[in-house]
From Swiss-Prot:
SUPFAM superfamilies: P-loop containing nucleoside triphosphate hydrolases (SSF52540). NCBIfam families: PRK04040.1. It catalyses: AMP + ATP = 2 ADP. Keywords: ATP-binding, Cytoplasm, Kinase, Nucleotide-binding, Transferase. It comes from the Archaea. One of its GO terms (molecular function) is adenylate kinase activity. It comes from Methanoculleus marisnigri (strain ATCC 35101 / DSM 1498 / JR1). Its main location: cytoplasm. This is Adenylate kinase. GO terms for cellular component: cytoplasm. It holds the Pfam family AAA_17.
Amino acid sequence: MLGKKVVVTGVPGVGKTTVINGAMERLATEGVAYKAVNFGTFMFEVAKKENLASDRDEMRKLEKDVQKRLQQAAATGIAAMSGEANIIIDTHSTVKTPTGFLAGLPEWVLRELMPDIVVLVETDPDQILMRRLGDASRARDMEGYRAIAEHQEFNRAVSAAYAMYTGCTIKIVRNENFLLEQGIDDLVSVLR
């Protein structure tokens, strides 16, 4: 039997990786194994093997056709992993670029991955803004409340399109301030 393929997404600063890590720890104590894979890191590893990039930032400068091929290679590799295990794919539904929103899972990626579930980790935009302001370790674009709310709304719309294409379900998990355990509980219930 193939493992579950669960895509977990969220805007920068929502705490997506924190919720994923907490859920994986909890599931491990129950004997439910998942492997977490960061889609961008997987792409970079392929690019590095092919001597196309020495760091992740260089990937953005590659020709569009090369980037598409790297995305396809990453999607194929990650999909193959699900034959052996349950997989959490840590990625973004959309990426905000200077020219607009870019789909994080274009058609050629979805065709390979065919996720069972897409999870959107969300919280109130003001909480995300405060987290971003308090995180000196990351170089994130500064956005206001309205821009963060718009990004989360767009993620929902794009995720609905992903569901229409793949037949997957969509789950929204809230990661509210001081309620991390509740967010972890919600993700665990989806992953069981």
